[in-house]
Every structure is written in C-alpha cells, then in structure tokens.
Design a protein with these regions (language model features):
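Acidic, proline/glycine-enriched N-terminal capping motif
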Residues: 1-156
Length: 156
C-alpha cells in the first residue's frame, strides 16, 4: 500500500483536553479520561490507516476542535492530546511537527428564534457556529513538508 499524501481524521464527540498528571504516593498518574481519549484517537487512526507508516520528515498539523460549550478547555491542552496520541503512528515523534494551525470553534451565543429575531442560546438549542449547525467533533489533517537543504550543501 502506498503512503498517503496526507492523513485526515474526523472524530465525533466533544474534544477532550490533555489532563495534568496527578501525583499519588510519589507516582504520577495520567487521568483516565485523558488515557481513554488518547487510546480512542490512536485506535481511530489505526482503523482508518492500518498499513500506514509514520512520517519521518517535518509535518504540518491542522486541528479543528468543534466544542459543545464555550470557555474551557484551553486550546493548547486540546492540541497536546492530539500531538501525544499520534506519536508513533502519524509521525515518529511530535518534535517533527514544525508547523501547526489549531482552532477551537464554540457555539454561538445568539441563535435565530421562532419569532424571527435573535435570542440568547439555550441548553437545548442545536449547536451553531456563525449561524451554521454542527455536531461537536475533532478534525485533524497531517501533511508532510518537504525537507530542504541549501544549494551549496547539495552540490558538495
């Protein structure tokens, strides 16, 4: 099987941030929610790309986190979970990610009401972003970047 030119993955459900390890009796324990989310992302990647080998070159990672609520978690913690989960399957090491673009999409505060006017969003309303409905999910795209060497070095 030929190596894909890029990896894409869409995971339904609310994106999960990387939790801080807790220390008990001198041992660091990763929260169960974080472990389950990392295992799920790893498994979904393997399911979609069973024969793919990890990229060995620099890569660009794009991630869109479509949330079910506003506010927390922080974007960097969401991205950390993705980077750590795909270590060894999409790329050899997350140090290869030299370019990234991450965005956290949150539901609109105002929705179009039944009376034809905007009103504050209520808990039972569908999720909308800029007026367009969506379901919470995570979208990831990983693309290899060409390795570059100066001309002087190539000739010698």
């Amino acid at each position: 099987m030929e190596q894909p030119s890029e990896f894409t993955l869409c995971l339904p459900g609310d994106p999960v941030p990387k939790g801080r390890p807790r220390v008990y009796n001198g041992h660091a324990m990763t929260p169960k929610r974080t472990v389950r989310a990392e295992e799920r992302l790893f498994a979904e990647f393997r399911l979609k790309y069973p024969q793919a080998k990890p990229y060995q070159c620099p890569v660009r990672l794009e991630a869109e986190f479509w949330m079910s609520h506003r506010g927390r978690p922080d974007l960097d913690n969401l991205l950390k979970l993705v980077l750590d989960s795909l270590n060894g399957v999409a790329y050899v090491d997350d140090a290869q990610v030299v370019e990234s673009h991450a965005s956290k999409r949150m539901p609109d505060l105002w929705v179009y009401g039944a009376k034809g006017r905007y009103r504050k969003r209520k808990s039972g309303d569908p999720y909308t972003y800029c007026g367009h409905e969506y379901e919470p999910h995570l979208y990831i795209r990983i693309k290899p970047l060409p390795e570059w060497e100066p001309k002087e070095r190539k000739q010698s």
